[in-house]
Amino acid sequence: MMIYSCGDVDFLLQNLDEKDLVFSHHSKKRIGQRLINKAFVKNMLFNFDPIEILPGDFANAFKLFYPSQFNPRKELVVVIAVNEINVVVKSLWEN
């Protein structure tokens, strides 16, 4: 299993293809609960550089920070897991 760094994730996001992006079941629940628009999240991942990329709580997991969809004083936090095939959105929330 390849171990990715924050720099690797930045490069992967720049070259991400829509078929390689997967939303986990848990993230879909959060989208509904928090009224976060899936299209907004996809737009951020495909078209904007994250404000910051931090390592997540387990190997190949990362926290990406983007501007909030609803509140300019908050950030959208997107937790992803990366493997050789996909980028999986595990969870998201506004901070």
Please annotate each region the language model reported.
Residues 1-95:
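Ribonuclease/tRNase effector modules and their secretory precursors
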